[in-house]
Regions:
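Feature for soluble, non-membrane regions of globular proteins
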Residues: 1-2, 142
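Positively charged n-region of N-terminal signal peptides that target proteins for export
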Residues: 2-13
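Composition-driven detection of intrinsically disordered, low-complexity segments
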Residues: 8, 16-17, 34
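Sec-dependent N-terminal signal peptides
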Residues: 13-21
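C-terminal motif of bacterial Sec signal peptides marking the signal peptidase cleavage site
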Residues: 24-25
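N-terminal low-complexity, Pro/Thr/Ser-rich intrinsically disordered segments
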Residues: 32-51
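A short Gly-Trp-Pro
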Residues: 42, 51-85, 91-171
């Protein structure tokens, strides 16, 4: 009986060790992918240049694929008429008429401002399978898109406020 328990514990320790050593290599691969992607965008800067241009929080979201806490972003409940742009490169991304309150804590849109403004990419991070959205001009991480939107498109582009800026429509 003691041998069975010892054997089971040993298997668990080995499995846990494998998982712990595999995790950093997965993160390193994602970091390498992001570095390689930078070179394929119209606006391509070094990480040092992005760090100088963006605040620490903006850099975390846009360049390191971070997420701001829900209900804390300046554009979550913002419904003025205008255009939401990429905070890193100023590319237009979303029109205000596509914005809606999804009650999720982040700004939500039912589509991009025009075809090709946003790139969708498979994201298997954090044990989930999602679709990441990136600015097509600079590759900045915007958030994720889900197929549970309440509008005719059926989509919900869930965007970090830190990844966008807003230009008010002229009256």
């Amino acid at each position: 009986m003691v041998e069975v328990i010892r054997y089971t514990c040993m298997k668990q320790v080995i499995l846990l060790s494998i998982l712990l050593f595999a995790s950093p290599s997965c993160d390193a691969q994602n970091s390498t992918e992001m570095s390689n992607e930078q070179n394929s965008f119209e606006v391509a800067k070094s990480e040092q240049e992005w760090q100088k241009q963006l605040s620490a929080e903006e850099y975390y979201v846009l360049r390191q694929r971070g997420t701001e806490r829900p209900f804390t972003g300046e554009y979550n409940m913002h419904f003025e008429e205008g255009t939401y742009n990429c905070r890193a490169c100023s590319a237009p991304l979303f029109a205000s008429d596509s914005k809606f309150d999804s009650h999720c804590g982040w700004p939500s849109f039912d589509g991009g401002i025009e075809s090709g403004a946003i790139i969708e990419k498979l994201d298997k991070s954090h044990g989930m399978i999602r679709t990441e959205i990136l600015c097509a001009k600079c590759g900045g991480h915007l958030g994720h898109v889900f197929n549970d939107g309440p509008t005719a498109t059926g989509l919900r582009y869930c965007v970090n406020s830190l990844s966008i800026s807003f230009d008010k429509e002229d009256e």
